[in-house]
């Protein structure tokens, strides 16, 4: 128990009057953690809640529920249970979907019962497997360190207090304390890469050193420190701004970054904004204007760079529609309001035109022209280029018409005709 109690001291985890939610499966690891907690917390019957999700992947999964009911009843601990309906099981990627459903259940339970800490029974062998798995799949140090020792899930702090324990140590703990548990038979199969690493690779590595768990923990701490340093450096830079369907920044803000830093910076931006790991390694090898990586696109255009999540690009509504002033309306996945008055919201532009209560809005068709102050017309694509708007984003720029003439194009153009009777229209966006 010394290593267990040290975890809370080292990480400044307050215990008194705090609520703990244990994600339990009925396996040897979570049973050991349950037993440690009921012997560690000052008032476990009031401080501890156990959450169990039956994934409905095995016929005998009901045995886990029976065991947890027996354990929690014996110690007067609240047990919350839920099943993952078979109808929701996907044909592919079931592990990822199961994890997603499980953490949604835990987040909901934590919020409902105002929990302070969520605990999982991940241990040192899990950490080793995770490092090897992510090394094989990506080689990204940030991904290899994805099993954080202390993290967050919604409003709860996520704790993994068994991370310095090996699997063998936990099995010995269960045996010494006479604890029953359920073995998941699928863990003994070789159908997944994680299981093959567990059965064949990790045992070989353990033969080479008695400090494998300790070394994995040290690697995790070192990787976390390096990641924090890198993130602090990137946060010190001038960061891009939200630009409708993209992030937009100035190329001049990147001039002090070398190619490796540049690639890492864009990886960082994608993860910060969309919580996906991508690698713009191609920046290191090729000089070009557009880079595509999975569902993301990086564009260098004129004086700007753009990061676009193409999954967030909604179908273009090509038809004009009539809207009323001072009433919110949606267009191409964005919400706007146009008013003569000042409103609460993000003012993205304004224009002057004849007074009316109704306007036409939509996307500017290709080939359109815009009227200049001297009465001549210019091609809209020229104005888009002057303002550094790439082709893929142009249809998402709000256009407003009066009397069939464009009087406003978001981030590009405002009516240049003058008339003493014109009034000002303010354009607000609500993201």
Curated annotation (Swiss-Prot):
* Entry text on domains: The N-terminal region contains the highly conserved SGGXDS motif, predicted to be a P-loop motif involved in ATP binding.
Q: List the disulfide bonds.
A: none
Q: Which gene encodes it?
A: tilS
Identify the EC number(s).
6.3.4.19
Question: InterPro entries per the record?
Answer: Rossmann-like_a/b/a_fold, TilS/TtcA_N, tRNA_Ile_lys_synt, tRNA_Ile_lys_synt_N
Which one of the record's GO molecular function terms can you name? Answer: tRNA(Ile)-lysidine synthase activity
Taxonomically, what lineage is the organism? Bacteria, Bacillati, Bacillota, Bacilli, Lactobacillales
How is this protein annotated for GO cellular component?
cytoplasm
Q: What does this protein do?
A: Ligates lysine onto the cytidine present at position 34 of the AUA codon-specific tRNA(Ile) that contains the anticodon CAU, in an ATP-dependent manner. Cytidine is converted to lysidine, thus changing the amino acid specificity of the tRNA from methionine to isoleucine.
Kindly state which keywords UniProt assigns to this record, in alphabetical order.
ATP-binding, Cytoplasm, Ligase, Nucleotide-binding, tRNA processing
The main place the protein resides is cytoplasm
GO terms in the biological process aspect are: tRNA modification
Q: What is the protein's given name?
A: tRNA(Ile)-lysidine synthase
Binding positions for ATP?
25-30
Q: Which organism is it from?
A: Lactobacillus gasseri (strain ATCC 33323 / DSM 20243 / BCRC 14619 / CIP 102991 / JCM 1131 / KCTC 3163 / NCIMB 11718 / NCTC 13722 / AM63)
Name its cellular compartments.
Answer: Cytoplasm
Record's catalysed reaction(s): cytidine(34) in tRNA(Ile2) + L-lysine + ATP = lysidine(34) in tRNA(Ile2) + AMP + diphosphate + H(+)
Family statement drawn from the similarity comment of this UniProt entry: Belongs to the tRNA(Ile)-lysidine synthase family.
């Amino acid at each position: 128990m010394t290593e267990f109690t040290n975890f809370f001291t080292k990480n400044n985890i307050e215990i008194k009057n705090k609520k703990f939610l244990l994600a339990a499966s009925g396996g040897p690891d979570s049973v050991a953690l349950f037993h440690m907690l009921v012997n560690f917390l000052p008032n476990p019957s009031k401080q501890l809640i156990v959450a169990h999700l039956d994934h409905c992947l095995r016929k005998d999964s009901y045995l886990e529920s029976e065991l947890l009911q027996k354990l929690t009843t014996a110690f007067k601990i609240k047990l919350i249970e839920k099943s993952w309906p078979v109808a929701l099981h996907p044909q592919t990627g079931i592990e990822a979907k199961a994890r997603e459903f499980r953490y949604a259940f835990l987040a909901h339970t934590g919020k409902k019962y105002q929990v302070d800490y969520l605990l999982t029974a991940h241990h040192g062998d899990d950490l080793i497997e995770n490092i090897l798995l992510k090394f094989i799949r990506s080689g990204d140090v940030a991904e290899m360190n994805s099993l954080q020792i202390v993290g967050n899930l919604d409003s709860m702090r996520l704790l993994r207090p068994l991370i310095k324990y090996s699997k063998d140590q936990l099995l010995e703990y269960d045996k010494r304390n006479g604890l029953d548990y359920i073995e998941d038979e699928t863990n003994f199969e070789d159908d997944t890469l994680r299981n093959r690493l567990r059965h064949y690779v990790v045992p070989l590595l353990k033969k080479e050193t008695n400090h494998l768990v300790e070394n994995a923990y040290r690697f995790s701490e070192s990787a976390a420190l390096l990641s924090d340093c890198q993130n602090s450096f990137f946060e010190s830079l001038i960061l891009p701004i939200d630009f409708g369907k993209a992030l937009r920044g100035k190329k001049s803000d990147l001039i002090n970054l070398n190619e490796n830093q540049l690639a890492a910076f864009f990886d960082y931006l994608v993860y910060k904004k969309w919580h996906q790991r991508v690698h713009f390694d191609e920046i290191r090898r090729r000089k070009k204007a557009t880079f595509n990586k999975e569902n993301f696109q990086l564009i260098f255009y004129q004086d700007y760079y753009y990061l676009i999540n193409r999954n967030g690009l909604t179908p273009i509504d090509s038809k004009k529609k009539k809207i009323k002033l001072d009433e919110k309306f949606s267009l191409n996945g964005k919400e706007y309001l146009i008013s003569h008055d000042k409103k609460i919201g993000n003012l993205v532009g304004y224009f002057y035109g004849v007074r009316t209560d109704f306007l036409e809005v939509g996307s500017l068709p290709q080939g359109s022209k815009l009227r200049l102050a001297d009465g001549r017309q210019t091609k809209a694509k020229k104005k888009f280029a002057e303002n550094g708007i790439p082709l893929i984003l142009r249809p998402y720029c709000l256009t407003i018409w009066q009397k069939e003439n464009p009087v406003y194009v978001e981030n590009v153009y405002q009516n240049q005709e003058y008339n003493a009777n014109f009034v000002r229209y303010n354009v607000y966006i609500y993201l």
